[in-house]
């Protein structure tokens, strides 16, 4: 038989989804894959029930149902501080994952270089490679996960065409400051680089910090694509609804790839999601307060147990240091498998997020009901006995 594609020969299956499968097999509490165990807003579920009987159930307009795009334009326009045209500057996608892939194919040519920070969400490397591009990594330095502007400029100077930024950042929990984003923006403008933003955690930020949108920085709207989804903000990770926002000339290219890649998003889910997108502003305050509550439970529990970790500025992830529990020669992958099978808690090995040779970090998440978090902490409290 003829040779299969070489595009995916250098990456494996998703480590995150693998840990979910292992957690399911052994009945572990899944703190690996970042999805909640509580319901989305009741208003959205009630609307979905009605839509299930009334429709729509057929193909939508490829770019997304008009009322869905209009709701995104209103909601995002408020938070971004600009008017967004739903007819020319938005496309609905199958989660932010598809938005990122469509954007890469719309902007990049084979061999182009894409800068990303390390640690990074594992999908980014695979997506860049699938686009026949070269990933270039710039380290975020713990514990604050700051970056060296000179190192970043070296990466740009080497011929970068785009930079991918997750803000707030998965897995580090870093929230990029306005000053940091302006530093990146200056480099993007100077070296003519596109900014591809993954902003799915935009409303999960702690301790009075503020999410700054890259496309709101002067000179950046013209070269920025903002990718996001409803998965986190409305607790509907299984609905797979996302979107991209970009200037008209870029959006026209993204829509072409979306059209032939996905045809469209699920019609009934877009209809039900409009209710969520039209929630009053108080919803986002209550949503943020709920996540601050879950974070407090989990981080206080981790401190009481004595597991070292990095306190996140945003997102619902914690990077924990497993150095005290690693056996000699044990990999972080094996540790996580044993943690799921013996301690009953699912985690993700940190090596799947870092370009650097990391073996002592795991990622845990706390988007769970109180009782789930307390049960997970109780199991982690016996980690020394069970490993």
Predicted regions, residues:
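Helix C-cap/helix->beta junction micro-motif
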Residues: 26, 131, 190-191, 305, ...
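A short helix->loop->beta-strand "cap" motif at the edges of active sites that frequently abuts
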Residues: 112, 133, 190-194, 221-222
């Amino acid at each position: 038989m003829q040779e299969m594609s070489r595009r995916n020969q250098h990456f494996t299956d998703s480590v995150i989804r693998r840990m979910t499968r292992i957690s399911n097999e052994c009945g572990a509490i899944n703190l690996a894959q970042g999805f909640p165990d509580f319901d989305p807003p009741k208003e959205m579920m009630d609307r979905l029930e009605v839509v299930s009987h009334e429709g729509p159930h057929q193909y939508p307009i490829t770019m997304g149902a008009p009322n869905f795009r209009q709701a995104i334009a209103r909601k995002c326009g408020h938070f971004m501080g600009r008017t967004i045209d739903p007819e020319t500057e938005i496309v609905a996608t199958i989660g932010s994952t598809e938005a990122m892939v469509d954007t890469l194919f719309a902007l990049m040519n084979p061999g182009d270089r894409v800068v990303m920070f390390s640690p990074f969400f594992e999908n980014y490397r695979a997506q860049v490679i699938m686009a026949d591009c070269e990933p270039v990594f710039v380290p975020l330095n713990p514990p604050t996960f700051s970056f060296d502007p000179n190192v970043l400029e070296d990466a740009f100077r080497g011929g970068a065409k785009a930079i991918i930024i997750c803000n707030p950042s998965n897995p580090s929990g870093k929230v990029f400051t306005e000053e940091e984003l302006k530093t990146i923006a200056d480099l993007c403008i100077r070296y003519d680089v596109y900014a591809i933003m993954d902003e799915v955690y935009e409303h999960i930020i702690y301790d009075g910090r503020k999410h700054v949108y890259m496309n709101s920085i002067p000179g950046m709207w013209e070269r920025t694509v903002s990718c996001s989804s409803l998965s986190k903000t409305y607790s509907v990770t299984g609905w797979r609804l996302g979107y991209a926002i970009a200037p008209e000339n870029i959006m026209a290219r993204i829509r072409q790839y979306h059209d032939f890649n996905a045809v469209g998003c699920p019609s009934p889910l877009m209809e039900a999601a409009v209710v969520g997108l039209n929630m009053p502003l108080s919803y986002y305050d209550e949503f943020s307060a709920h996540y601050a509550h879950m974070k407090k439970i989990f981080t206080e529990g981790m401190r009481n147990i004595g597991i070292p970790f990095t306190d996140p500025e945003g997102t619902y992830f914690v990077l924990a240091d497993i150095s005290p529990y690693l056996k000699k020669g044990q990999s972080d992958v094996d540790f996580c498998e044993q943690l799921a099978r013996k301690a009953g808690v699912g985690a993700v090995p940190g090596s799947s997020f870092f370009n650097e040779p990391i073996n002592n970090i795991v990622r845990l998440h706390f988007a769970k009901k109180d009782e789930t978090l307390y049960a997970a902490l109780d199991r982690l409290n016996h980690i020394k006995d069970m490993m």
